[in-house]
Amino acid sequence: MNPLIVSPRSPRTIIAFALSALLLGGCATFSNDGGFNTVTQITQDRAGKTVKAIRSDDDAASVQSSIKARLAKPLDAGDAVQIALLNNRGLQATYAELGIAEADLVQAGRLHNPGFTFRRTRQGDDVLIERTFTMNLISLITAPLAQKIEGRRFEQVKLLVANEALRVAAETRRAYFDAIAGGQGVDYARQVNLAAEAGADLAHQMGRSGNWSALEQAREQAFYAEATAGVARAMKASVMAREKLTRLMGLWGDDIHFQLPERLPELPAQPLELDNAESMALQNRLDIQAGKLETAGLASSLGLTKTTRFVNVLDLGYIHNNQTGLPPERGYELSIEIPLFDWGGARVTKAEAIYMQSLHRLAETAVNARSDVRESYLGYRTAYDLARHYRDNIVPLRKKISDENLLRYNGMLISVFELLADAREQVASVNGYFDALKDYWIAETDLQAALGGKLPDNNSVMKGQ
């Protein structure tokens, strides 16, 4: 490569230009919060809870102190969610994505390191010294656009991290209600088992006295055996639900012995009315907002690819050569890649395909969000109506039937076995209400997630729940 020699003034201009570029490139620094303030604000606004990235022993001690204070009393759903947001290790790993994205942003704002070449050769008594200082001009020209692309990427990661925090919060709420319902399921199974045991004992005694057939005895014994198996199944389901909640909260050791309320929260007085659920979802969902940022970033990347389609390598160098007996040789050299075989068409086509792929995925996300919120709202209203139906109709009717049967039993109009069977049916109706109540709270959580993590102000969500 032959250097092009210019007047002594031009190299000074080149050096000044290079130093200015380096100074500007060095201005790219890390933010004080590492992007975490956005995640904190979104989580506080939509879930009413705080988040904290554990980066030091002091942070870990502060988090543990907060967790211990909440574990000292029976947990409500809000406590469980707060513990998960602070202590879930998978979520803490997600928080680290902010640091990775910001590092990429800062790196995009910094120029490539310049190169310096020194060469000394001797030919007889003659000494030739060559000095070359080079810079990558392409990185200088494209740095603003690259930084803009990474800036959008950083904003996208903020939304994705906040969305993951809201997902963990929703999953913890579901697990919380499942865990309480699991405990109630064990209580119901034990009540049924006690009634079945009483019926089996009575049938055995009456059979021994000849007042009960072997067939009837076998039926009562079979029901008792099935009820005993039901207790085992209920206990297993309860342990699994509680362990899922434990994992989401990131608890271990003595902390796993946390206390839960014995009963689920009662049904709200009125359900939530939504007339614009789809528009709310499209406006508030973080996955849609992140998808828009991704698409905008890819559009910028496509522009960058087209900009560097023909010229991908462009180096500018300042030359200072000294040779014995000759005046110094100064100038600059320009190194450029010749697009002889690769005209950049493949890279542009690939960038265009990736951009179109992002557009279609964003459209898919929007379509799925509309469907998700419609389905969630239907499930929410159905769950509310079903729970209210159990509370206002089925349970009162079963109680009335039980009261009437007790009067008939006292009047010797029905047998004790009929009374026990009626008691089992009444317990089943109450348990059905508890199941419907659990389904309602989970359905409300699903609706909240489908709307972007927050229900309207006139919602039926219990504060603290």
Language-model features, listed with the residues they occupy:
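Short segments within alpha-helical structural elements
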Residues: E197, E226-G253, R361, A369, ...
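A small-residue-enriched
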Residues: C27-K49, Q82-S139, R242-L251, N276-A346, ...
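Amphipathic alpha-helical coiled-coil scaffold segments and their short linker/junction regions
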Residues: R70, A80-N87, I149, W212, ...
